[in-house]
């Protein structure tokens, strides 16, 4: 299975990403890493995801969900 998960560096998205990876899903994580709260915290979460034992199933796309062209490319590609 494959999922596109928005906000993958946020609190809920981070935990969902790890859970989906544990379930052997391919996760396309979308996040713009805005400064709503600590960018360092978000980057640390991404680092932890990339260290996950099934990290080969994780694809990160840095973009905003309000960027239609970028999201369209992601949906077409994956």
Regions found by a protein language model. Name each.
Residues 1-78:
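N-terminal Rossmann-like NAD(P)+-binding domain of SDR-like oxidoreductases, especially those catalyzing
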